Amino acid sequence: MKALRRFTVRAHLPERLAALDQLSTNLRWSWDKPTQDLFAAIDPALWEQCGHDPVALLGAVNPARLDELALDAEFLGALDELAADLNDYLSRPLWYQEQQDAGVAAQALPTGIAYFSLEFGVAEVLPNYSGGLGILAGDHLKSASDLGVPLIAVGLYYRSGYFRQSLTADGWQHETYPSLDPQGLPLRLLTDANGDPVLVEVALGDNAVLRARIWVAQVGRVPLLLLDSDIPENEHDLRNVTDRLYGGDQEHRIEQEILAGIGGVRAIRAYTAVEKLTPPEVFHMNEGHAGFLGIERIRELVTDAGLDFDTALTVVRSSTVFTTHTPVPAGIDRFPLEMVQRYVNDQRGDGRSRLLPGLPADRIVALGAEDDPAKFNMAHMGLRLAQRANGVSLLHGRVSRAMFNELWAGFDPDEVPIGSVTNGVHAPTWAAPQWLQLGRELAGSDSLREPVVWQRLHQVDPAHLWWIRSQLRSMLVEDVRARLRQSWLERGATDAELGWIATAFDPNVLTVGFARRVPTYKRLTLMLRDPDRLEQLLLDEQRPIQLIVAGKSHPADDGGKALIQQVVRFADRPQVRHRIAFLPNYDMSMARLLYWGCDVWLNNPLRPLEACGTSGMKSALNGGLNLSIRDGWWDEWYDGENGWEIPSADGVADENRRDDLEAGALYDLLAQAVAPKFYERDERGVPQRWVEMVRHTLQTLGPKVLASRMVRDYVEHYYAPAAQSFRRTAGAQFDAARELADYRRRAEEAWPKIEIADVDSTGLPDTPLLGSQLTLTATVRLAGLRPNDVTVQGVLGRVDAGDVLMDPVTVEMAHTGTGDGGYEIFSTTTPLPLAGPVGYTVRVLPRHPMLAASNELGLVTLA
């Protein structure tokens, strides 16, 4: 029979073991092996049975065992030491505090940052993630904690998390959703001074009110606030708003995003008030899902500070950072405009929004405008609400500038103000203990941030590096066999049929991993383009390859499920099933062993559709060699010695032809380059050339792929400038914000009437030479703006056959006087910087000291 209701009863700990509660509820244990070892020592078998979950362990352990441990001097000594270490970690000055103590930086660094994401992959015990976006967000929090960055994170608590994947007998993906009891997770409920749960409220249409309680997950030093709508105060339908991640229709999705954005800001206000913390100065949107946070902050400033909409928008923009993770328009949340209007529009007949009281509904809707007038674009809203934006690799930054060029019409894609911060991964989470121990021996500490530590790997005997790689491969093979057996049993097989699994996979065979989400562009089945060729590689008598595949398809994506089924059916064939497997239910625990044990990490997306691709970074962090299309981070950091590049047929329009070409290149690389190097051994059985690639990979990529590097980049290039801008706009009763908002209004009104009436060039000899002096003079009608309100630039560069400027350089032109009819004269003299076919033009841009860049407003007039 089934229980009517499920809940979790936590164990009562003996007083002497009270520190176990703090150690179990701060998720720092998930990346601190000594703490994990302490919990394992309580009951090793139960630790495995509980899936390495300290809260579950403490709830299930025999009370007599706890009483025994309360008298165990050795255990108590370890407990006290780890509790003291955690308290020291939470309070001691770290990198961020050292920067503040340095003096100059202290005035630039924000006092607090709010980080919003719809998913967070912090640890297996909190399955609030579906893929790379969530894992990246989790690594961001953990690295921010390790660096001492004062971050508060905000997301949603999904009662069913993300689905558990299994396979049917014929290889079709089947989804089941767990029921997660927050009382049984490392969470605490945010309560007020009276001990009552703090609730946030958001007014929806038809007089409905969505309420949510706030669970707090402590991620080291970083609190993660998770909003939960499954409370009695909500009507039945609204209780389901946070039921599952990516599980509903668009109506469900927009309600989640409204709660995450608007409710998330209100949750931060409640949390900082309860904890008596300084409110964050900078707000970071990890994708456009939480874009409504910017509108809620505008509402606060309009309601509480009495600002007009434009001035409030100016303050919000100055302190907001937007990160885009998608390289294709199809990856952007776009809602029907009619749906958005239902939530934000006039509910009372005065043109004001009920969702965001005090704000004109038409201004809210305009923030999400795009080319299709029937759509509301969340990424466009995010970009309009943020003064600073970035992609997640150098290549993705370029792709994003082209994709969002329409918001800065008149500018070349290279000039679109979207930068890049290449993603990184959290080493203590993803590096195998053997590598971390070697790092401690080389560095004398746990710090892996400095490149010099990685360079010390040259001291290590190749045989030792190979021993680590072989040990990790053996661990992976054991795990694969266990998972393979479980999967076959779930699909209806019996133990009597599964004797072959005991010898499936071989700890001495070249092991290739491919594990990720299964959208079409990642091309899960590229490896199957020529099944016979793949079979030859798997079964080669001298140089065999074994392949481990994993990944989840979105529940609504039957196309992705069909790709998985193709792989499963191939892997089920008796002649190859000992060399290739599809492992269901890809999650953090499986991923970790794959990154540790795979010799080669395969990635074959359609270029340039991979924004970053951090799975390959995690493999590199463990000495795995990447075999990848030059996309995402690999385009940036591949150097010819840290793996292999799969040639991409970028110019081929026929998709089938392109897949055939790239699959053929993949097979050739495996057969002719990868496998020979792996199996070439010296007299000690060590593949010297392979190990040197492993060493080179660790030395060159190790310090680059770290999330600590990524978070430092955000702090220095995005958070600190945003905090400085916020202090200027919010200081002195918002006078600077009012001035900038007024300037923007004047500029936008004048811009359609600005005219470059004439451009004159003088000074060049009859045959211009490189370095010859060119004088440009422009006559400009400013339509009421002052000369110091604009920047006039000469733009010079090589020209193609259509007279399009290539790689232009800009030269600022000085105001030299006023001509007839009120026209302003601007002039400059500059040496010709290039040889060959050269052209020039002149343009006018806005100028204001508080703009992050002259192209920020998207206004430009060309001659």
Swiss-Prot record:
Its cofactor is pyridoxal 5'-phosphate. The keyword Kinase does not apply. This is Glycogen phosphorylase. The modification N6-(pyridoxal phosphate)lysine is found at residue 618. Transmembrane segments: none annotated. It comes from the Bacteria. Pfam families: DUF3417 (PF11897), Phosphorylase (PF00343). GO terms for biological process: glycogen metabolic process. The lineage of its organism: Bacteria, Bacillati, Actinomycetota, Actinomycetes, Mycobacteriales. Phosphorylase is an important allosteric enzyme in carbohydrate metabolism. Enzymes from different sources differ in their regulatory mechanisms and in their natural substrates. However, all known phosphorylases share catalytic and structural properties. It is an enzyme of class 2 (transferase). Keywords: Allosteric enzyme, Carbohydrate metabolism, Glycogen metabolism, Glycosyltransferase, Pyridoxal phosphate, Transferase. Signal peptide: none annotated. GO terms for molecular function: glycogen phosphorylase activity; pyridoxal phosphate binding. Belongs to the glycogen phosphorylase family. Its EC number is 2.4.1.1. The gene is glgP. It comes from Mycobacterium tuberculosis (strain CDC 1551 / Oshkosh). It catalyses: [(1->4)-alpha-D-glucosyl](n) + phosphate = [(1->4)-alpha-D-glucosyl](n-1) + alpha-D-glucose 1-phosphate. NCBIfam families: more_P_ylases.
